[in-house]
């Protein structure tokens, strides 16, 4: 059908919004971490007698959505005719997403398969999007081979770079670095101007003790010419990983000057690494005040403050995360 990009997976890296860190034992925050190095669900903080965890955030934010979806799904799927397959597909998809976010991975796999069953053989952007979710649920449920098969089916259909990359991550998790490297190489050959793809490859390789080889990918990414504010932001992230904080600040400033709010978050991280907590807080606050920060960003900012020993500020971030 000539489709190259699944729904929600526009070039430039936004597909990371729906995938996860396969190298983390628990999968990482749902819908956030495709790369190693981010905060995982295992992080738990006890401050003044209160427990803050990724799971706390997930349950608070998603419990009502899951309950509502269960009710809607039950109502829609018990009395619908053949003309309601599109509604059924959307209901199963949403139910599957909520199951993932609440740790019911087997139920999620079943829901996504039922969503696909409503398509009656047609394959479009929505079906590919559901396949990505299904592969995620399969991996998290422990069905690693099933996840590989699902990514392979996507690759057979349209050779999408996202699927190559994610399958490569799973091969690394299976200790099959040769196949993983092959998939990473193919992913970049299909989409060689995606900064986040280079970042993802680096962090996965670094996670598995191949840091020097990973840095080669970062060096290659820096050979690309920045064209957009997002490009400058991603270059800033790369310079940060390479320890070149001055260049990181310069690139991130360009992104901020072009009104890319998210760049404030990464600027805060740079100053955190430089030990300049005042500047770090200034940029974190700008990002927080923008209203664009989500629960996972706030938890990461809280973790940074925990690492820095500024517990009162950490509590503020954690509490703000709970309120979203």
Question: Which residues make up each language-model segment?
Answer:
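Start-of-helix register in tetratricopeptide repeats
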Residues: 90, 124-129, 162, 196, ...
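Canonical tetratricopeptide repeat
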Residues: 94, 126-129, 133, 140, ...
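Register position in tetratricopeptide repeats
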Residues: 101-102, 140, 173-174, 207-208, ...
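Structural marker of alpha-solenoid helical repeat scaffolds
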Residues: 118, 122, 156-157, 190, ...
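C-terminal motif of bacterial Sec signal peptides marking the signal peptidase cleavage site
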Residues: 75-79
């Amino acid at each position: 059908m000539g489709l190259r990009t699944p729904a929600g997976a526009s070039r430039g890296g936004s597909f990371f919004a729906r995938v996860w860190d396969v190298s983390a034992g628990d999968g990482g925050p749902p819908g956030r971490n495709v790369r190693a190095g981010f905060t995982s669900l295992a992080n738990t903080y006890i401050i003044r007698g209160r427990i803050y965890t990724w799971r706390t955030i997930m349950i608070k934010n998603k419990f009502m959505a899951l309950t509502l979806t269960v009710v809607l799904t039950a109502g829609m799927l018990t009395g619908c005719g053949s003309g309601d397959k599109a509604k059924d597909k959307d209901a199963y998809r949403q139910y599957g997403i909520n199951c993932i976010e609440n740790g019911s991975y087997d139920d999620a796999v079943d829901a996504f398969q039922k969503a696909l069953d409503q398509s009656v053989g047609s394959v479009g952007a929505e079906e590919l999007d559901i396949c990505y979710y299904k592969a995620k649920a399969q991996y998290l449920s422990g069905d690693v081979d099933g996840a590989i098969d699902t990514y392979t089916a996507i690759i057979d259909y349209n050779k999408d770079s996202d699927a190559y990359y994610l399958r490569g991550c799973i091969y690394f998790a299976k200790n099959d670095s040769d196949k993983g490297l092959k998939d990473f190489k193919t992913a970049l050959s299909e989409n060689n101007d995606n900064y986040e793809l280079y970042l993802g490859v680096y962090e996965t390789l670094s996670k598995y003790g191949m840091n020097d080889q990973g840095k080669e990918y970062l060096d290659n990414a820096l050979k690309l010419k920045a064209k957009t504010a997002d490009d400058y932001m991603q270059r800033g992230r790369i310079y940060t990983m390479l320890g070149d904080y001055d260049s990181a600040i310069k690139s991130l400033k360009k992104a901020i000057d072009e009104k890319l709010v998210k760049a404030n978050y990464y600027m805060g991280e740079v100053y955190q690494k430089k030990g300049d907590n005042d500047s770090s807080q200034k940029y974190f606050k700008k990002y927080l005040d923008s209203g664009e920060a989500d629960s996972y960003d706030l938890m990461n900012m809280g973790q940074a403050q925990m690492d820095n020993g500024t517990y009162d500020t950490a509590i503020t971030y954690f509490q703000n995360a709970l309120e979203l």
